[in-house]
A protein has these predicted regions:
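Noncatalytic luminal/extracellular "stalk/propeptide" segments of secretory-pathway proteins
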Residues: 2-7, 11, 32-35, 39-140
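Soluble metallo-hydrolase cores and metallopeptidase-like ectodomains found primarily
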Residues: 16, 103-136, 190-266, 277-289
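Second-shell loop/turn segments in exported
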Residues: 16-25, 43-53, 113-114, 125, ...
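Extracellular/luminal Protease-associated
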Residues: 50-52, 102-200, 371-374
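Mature extracellular/periplasmic domains of secretome proteins
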Residues: 137-139, 158-171, 186-192, 316-327, ...
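Acidic/histidine-rich catalytic neighborhood of metal-dependent amide-processing enzymes
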Residues: 151-156, 239, 261-355
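Active-site-adjacent substrate-binding region
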Residues: 235, 340-466, 529-533, 537-544
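Charged, amphipathic alpha-helical linkers/stalks
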Residues: 425-513
């Protein structure tokens, strides 16, 4: 694998501002922050879930650390959540011949607690758990065993609903040879439910699931008991932020991560807090005085926070955008961090708002990054940046890991494919890559500073308009929308004018003429809001589509 992240930028920078900044980037400090966060946990195994005491204590520590490094207006704000306070679960095979041996299991945010009850029943194996496997089965008073692969087949909600509507009293999920939880025999992967499920459910390791599966395939009858130390309740979670005030205080650049986690969550997402605070500290230590106000923010409810919804992972970000509409309206760049101290990619990859692709490309050249580079555009909601992007805020994020079958970005994958450790008990400091972490901290910090230094943000909507035009199949649309050709012409005009405005912004930035900069930026953000909120929609399956009417 090539090491694109070995560029330390020290000999390529055009400005003393950037040189001072990277000279003050102390990624060892950021590593210590991430390590410290893993100490805040509900059990010896980890867990900093929204609404738990561990999440609250972590948020307070982060606030104190923000103050210590010199951030201003440090604030903790709370919001309501459905707390999933999981400690442990066990599946025990009940046998007259052998002493029962409890097998440790995980569970799923959003499933109900069972209190002190122990669920006991006969196990029925339903293979992949789709409707065909339930033919002629009576599941009343039974526990089902399901083989899952949520990354490549069906998410848990679809499979668990099949069992629930047929009367299963509990669900045991396990894995086979592909997908999360299969890289090692002793992994337990924790994933959110993304729907309403009223049936208790647990997740077993590949090793333990195989024991049950093989016995059932051999025709043996298995009776098991399920116990679960889980408390679900109404609670409050938190987000924490601090600021470096700008000369233009009502325009914002946000650097964001989240600190809630399954298990220890070193990469996902203690590393993001390390990045956010590393960049904040380096800006302060270097003496950089920003034009716009920088907000350094971390969220305590990104993994889970609301039950019975597809977007249970958006709870914290949703609370932020409703509490702070002024941030949504006036943020010129939202820089999100996920798993920032690991990589499985062959080259630099970024998830970038379409209007910022040209800017980022030009900045990479200016910073002396000459390696391969590719990008994807945020057309769905998978993390906090997606929530802000859908509100019309320009976003970007470094992409460090993939699912093992993702090839669109080119070469990738292997030991650090995301399903091999993410949301498992092996997301710990052993996955840390110091060079990747330092590269991401320096690059993202410099991009944020560079955008801050631009009075006129040179946003370009030409690429978005090209994609919109490509989505207009005029032969099909003409049947129900007689103005399809007119719509196409409007998009082409927007594309042409956008290119002109982009070039004007470049010239104005070079000339240091700032008289109408605020008006220009506000117009740019309003255009982006219209594009993202009116033109970009989701279909019934939560896939991105363009709206044409």
């Amino acid at each position: 694998m090539s090491k694109y992240y070995e560029n330390n930028f020290e000999h390529n920078l055009p400005s003393e501002i950037f040189k001072k900044f990277i000279g003050c980037v102390d990624s060892e400090y950021g590593y210590s922050v991430a390590l410290k966060l893993t100490e805040f946990k509900s059990t010896d195994r980890g867990f900093r879930i929204a609404g738990t005491d561990a999440e609250a204590r972590a948020g307070k520590w982060i606030a104190e650390e923000m103050k210590r490094i010199g951030l201003k207006n440090v604030t903790i704000e709370e919001f309501p959540v459905d707390c999933w306070d999981f400690r442990e679960a066990y599946v025990t095979v009940l046998s007259e011949e052998n002493e029962p041996a409890p097998m440790f299991a995980g569970s799923f945010p959003g499933v109900p607690e069972i209190g002190d009850e122990i669920i006991t029943g006969e196990v029925v194996y339903v293979a992949e758990g789709t409707a065909a496997y339930y033919e002629n089965l009576d599941l009343r008073d039974k526990i089902v065993l399901i083989d899952t692969d949520c990354y490549h087949t069906y998410w848990f909600d679809s499979l668990f609903t099949q069992a629930e509507i047929r009367g299963a009293k509990a669900i045991i999920a396990t894995v086979t040879d592909q997908g999360p939880g299969t890289y090692r025999d002793d992994l337990i992967t924790i994933q959110n439910m993304q729907t309403k499920i009223d049936t208790p459910a647990v997740m077993m390791t590949k090793h333990d699931g195989e024991i049950l599966r093989n016995a059932l395939k051999e025709g043996k009858k298995l009776k098991v008991s399920i116990s679960m130390d889980l408390n679900t309740r109404k609670s409050v979670a938190h987000y924490v932020y601090g600021m470096i005030m700008g000369k233009n205080p009502d325009k914002y650049i946000i650097a964001s991560g989240h600190y809630d986690a399954y298990w220890e969550g070193f990469q996902d997402n203690a590393s993001s807090v390390g990045s956010v605070l590393t960049i904040a500290k380096a800006m302060i230590d270097s003496g950089y005085e920003p034009d716009k106000t920088f907000i350094f923010m971390v969220n305590g409810a990104e993994e889970f926070g609301t039950k019975n919804t597809r977007y249970d992972f958006c709870t914290g970000a949703n609370a932020i955008i409703h509490r702070h509409p002024e941030w949504v309206k006036n943020t010129v760049l939202f820089n999100n961090y996920e798993l920032s101290a690991i990589t499985d990619t062959e080259h630099l990859e970024l998830n970038i708002a379409p209007c910022f692709v040209k800017i980022i490309k030009s900045l990479l050249r200016i910073f002396g990054y000459n390696g391969d580079f590719s990008y994807i555009m945020p057309k769905g909601v998978g993390a906090d940046d997606g929530v802000f992007a859908k509100q019309g805020v320009p976003t970007y994020m470094t992409v460090c890991t993939h699912f093992s079958d993702v090839e669109a970005m080119g070469e990738s994958l292997g030991e650090y494919a995301i399903e091999n450790y993410d949301h498992t008990q092996f997301d710990n400091k052993d996955t840390y890559n110091a060079e990747v972490f330092d590269f991401n901290n320096k690059l993202n910090g410099m991009i944020n500073i560079a955008v801050d230094m631009m009075p006129y943000i040179p946003a370009d909507y030409a690429q978005e308009m090209d994609m919109y035009i490509d989505s207009i199949n005029t032969s099909e649309m003409r049947a129900f929308y007689r103005k399809a050709e007119e719509l196409k012409k409007i998009a082409e005009e927007i594309k042409e004018k956008s290119t002109i405005l982009y070039n004007h912004a470049i010239i104005l930035n070079q000339s240091n003429v700032c008289k109408h900069a605020n008006e220009y930026v506000e117009l740019m953000l309003e255009i982006n809001r219209i594009v993202q909120k009116e033109m970009c929609r989701f279909d019934p399956f939560h896939q991105f589509i363009y709206s044409h009417v």
